[in-house]
Amino acid sequence: MNIEQFTAALEEKGITLSPVQLEQFETYFRMLVEWNEKMNLTSITEKEEVYLKHFYDSISASFFIDFHKVTTICDIGAGAGFPSIPLKICFPHLHVTIVDSLQKRITFLNELAKGLNLQDTTFYHDRAETFGQRKEKRESYDLVTARAVARLSVLSELCLPLVKKEGLFVALKASAADEEMQAGKKAVTVLGGEVVEKHSFVLPLEESERNIIVIEKKKQTPKKYPRKPGTPNKSPIEG
C-alpha cells in the first residue's frame, strides 16, 4: 500500500489526512525502521507493508467505532505503538496511555512522541497485570485496546479492569475470532463485560482476514482481577 493508496483508502472511510498528518506517518515509518536496527520492534519493515499491516490495520478500529466520542484510550502491550499511535495521528484529540513490559520499547515510544510532536501521550513501563491493579487507573478509560497475540480470555483480564463502566474494550484480531470469542465468553462475563459487536473485514490489496471484537463494560470488575503477572496466561478464565 503506497502513500496514495493509503490516503485514498482512508478518504473512502471518511478520514482526510492533512499534510502534517501525512508527514507524521512518514516520520513514524522512518523512526520505526531506524530503531528496528538496534532493537526488535517489528519484522515488517518494507514501506508499503508498514503502511498496510501496521498503519492502516491500526486505524481500522475507527471504521466501526466513532473515535470522536472517545477521549481517553489505553493500549496494552502496544510494542511499537500499534494501534494507538496511528489512531492518535488521525484523531489528535485523543489522550493516549500505552503500557508495555519492555523498557526499550518505552524508550522508543518516548522518542517517537517527540519526533511526531504528540501531545497527551503517556507511556508506562509495567506489566498489564500490575498496571490494572493501580487504583487510579482502574475503570478510568473510555476505551482500552490490544492488538496482541494473546487469546481473548487472557486479553480480557488484562484490559477490562481498566475500562470505565459503559466504556469499550476493543480487541483487534486476525482470523479465528469466533473460536476465541467462544473460549473467552466466561472471562468477558466474569470481568464485567459483554460482547456487543464483531466486525470482520479483509485488508485491502493482500486480502487477509481481520476481526474487531467490541466488548462493552457493563459492571465493575471484581477487585481480584487482574491476577498476578503470568497467571492470566497460565490459567485463563475459561470453562
UniProtKB/Swiss-Prot annotation:
Enzyme Commission (EC) number: 2.1.1.-
Entry GO terms, CC: cytosol
Spans traversing the lipid bilayer: none
Alphabetized UniProt keyword annotations: Cytoplasm, Methyltransferase, rRNA processing, S-adenosyl-L-methionine, Transferase
Pfam families recorded: GidB
Region (Disordered), start-end ranges: 216-239
Keyword Membrane: no
An example Gene Ontology molecular-function term: rRNA (guanine-N7-)-methyltransferase activity
Subcellular location as annotated: Cytoplasm
Chain residues that bind S-adenosyl-L-methionine: G77, F82, A128, E129, R147
Role: Specifically methylates the N7 position of guanine in position 535 of 16S rRNA.
Family, per entry: Belongs to the methyltransferase superfamily. RNA methyltransferase RsmG family.
HAMAP family: 16SrRNA_methyltr_G (MF_00074)
The protein, known as: Ribosomal RNA small subunit methyltransferase G
Organism: Bacillus pumilus (strain SAFR-032)
Highest classification ranks of the organism: Bacteria, Bacillati, Bacillota, Bacilli, Bacillales
